[in-house]
Amino acid sequence: MARIAGVEIPRNKRVDVALTYIYGIGKARAKEALEKTGINPATRVKDLTEAEVVRLREYVENTWKLEGELRAEVAANIKRLMDIGCYRGLRHRRGLPVRGQRTRTNARTRKGPRKTVAGKKKAPRK
């Protein structure tokens, strides 16, 4: 297996797909990296030469923030929003949707499982 940005990428997959296993690299960035390094996207990881792996690793690690560094930056950005007390920060703090989605119904992913509240009991009829 090739190790890029601290991640073991799967050997039997195409290089363009295997690169997406790295946090911070999607399909577009994988395609860009392969174009810049001159590697055929259809090549399987196991068929890459050591020189190609090194070239790809150098390009990817020196061009973008990936994995732990990127996760830390995202967490720091969210913490900053919460610290300055802006609306987005408050939504993060309360665990509600941040980008204006409705919350009367839906938003279950963000709010978690339902917390049911007992309804008012009906008085027995006479």
Curated annotation (Swiss-Prot):
Residues 95-126 are annotated as: Disordered. GO terms for molecular function: rRNA binding; structural constituent of ribosome; tRNA binding. SUPFAM superfamilies: S13-like H2TH domain. It holds the Pfam family Ribosomal_S13. This is Small ribosomal subunit protein uS13. Signal peptide: none annotated. One of its GO terms (biological process) is translation. The lineage of its organism: Bacteria, Thermotogati, Deinococcota, Deinococci, Thermales.
